[in-house]
């Protein structure tokens, strides 16, 4: 690839990322649903849960509206009961958790995160789909992935464990992004 093609390609990637971010912000601001306002659990799976608060706001306040952080010298004045499940509060905002708990406030119990006999963070085939046990819930893909399955998954027993369907606006955004990617790919 010569320099011009490489430059066009990098501009295209930046353009796609900018468009997808605009659509993502539009979805978050327009839907008003908590599950779309926060990052998905799959996104959090690659990050430490102690970094992200459990109720992250969709739109962050301006820096002028934030409360200034307290210094370490004021830590004796902070609330010492910030941790759950017997965790020890450190500097008013961090927790040292007992062995079977984790999270910013020791709110996650490893012992309760299994899905019956299926351990947490384990993939398993279920009918014609793939499912994953995540924080005590079995989440299944609605598409057929396994060999020998021709159509959509017939999962009358898994309705409660499926992830929610995307609203029409999110589906439109997805198809629009795919179209943009395909048109850029055909350009090269």
Swiss-Prot record:
A Pfam family annotated for this UniProt entry: CFC
Question: What Gene Ontology cellular-component terms does the record carry?
Answer: apical plasma membrane; cell surface; extracellular region; extracellular space; membrane raft; plasma membrane; side of membrane
The protein's name is Protein Cripto
What's the domain of life for this entry?
A: Eukaryota
Locate the EGF-like domain: which residues? 78-107
Q: Where is the lipid attached (GPI-anchor amidated aspartate)?
A: 150
Which BP terms in the Gene Ontology apply to this protein?
anterior/posterior axis specification, embryo; anterior/posterior pattern specification; blood vessel development; cell differentiation; cell migration involved in sprouting angiogenesis; cellular response to epidermal growth factor stimulus; cellular response to fibroblast growth factor stimulus; cellular response to hepatocyte growth factor stimulus
Write down the species. Answer: Homo sapiens
Name its cellular compartments: Cell membrane; Secreted
Q: Disulfide pairs?
A: 82-89, 83-95, 97-106, 115-133, 128-149, 131-140
Q: How does it sit in the membrane?
A: Lipid-anchor; GPI-anchor
Modification after translation: The GPI-anchor is attached to the protein in the endoplasmic reticulum and serves to target the protein to the cell surface. There, it is processed by GPI processing phospholipase A2 (TMEM8A), removing an acyl-chain at the sn-2 position of GPI and releasing CRIPTO as a lysophosphatidylinositol-bearing form, which is further cleaved by phospholipase D (GPLD1) into a soluble form.
* UniProt keyword Cell division present: no
InterPro entries reported for this sequence: Cripto_growth_factor (IPR017047), Cryptic/Cripto_CFC-dom (IPR019011), EGF-like_dom (IPR000742)
Subunit description: Interacts with the activin type-1 receptor ACVR1B.
Give the record's glycosylation annotations as residue positions: 79
MF terms from GO for this chain are: activin receptor binding; growth factor activity; nodal binding; signaling receptor binding
């Amino acid at each position: 690839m010569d320099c011009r093609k490489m430059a066009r390609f990098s501009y295209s990637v930046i353009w796609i990322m900018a468009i997808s971010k605009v659509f993502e912000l539009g979805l978050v601001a327009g839907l008003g649903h908590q599950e779309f306002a926060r990052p998905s659990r799959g996104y959090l799976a690659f990050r430490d849960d102690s970094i992200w608060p459990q109720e992250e706001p969709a739109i962050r306040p301006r820096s002028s509206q934030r409360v200034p952080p307290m210094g370490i010298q004021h830590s004796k004045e902070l609330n010492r009961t910030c941790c759950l499940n017997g965790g020890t509060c450190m500097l008013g905002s961090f927790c040292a958790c007992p062995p079977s708990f984790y999270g910013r406030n020791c709110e996650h119990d490893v012992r309760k995160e299994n899905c019956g006999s299926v351990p947490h963070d384990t993939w398993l085939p279920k009918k014609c789909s793939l499912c994953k046990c995540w924080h005590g819930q079995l989440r299944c893909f609605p598409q057929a992935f396994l060999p020998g399955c021709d159509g959509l998954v017939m999962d009358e027993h898994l309705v409660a464990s499926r992830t929610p369907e995307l609203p029409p606006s999110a589906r439109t955004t997805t198809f629009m992004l795919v179209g943009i990617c395909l048109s850029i790919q055909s350009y090269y």
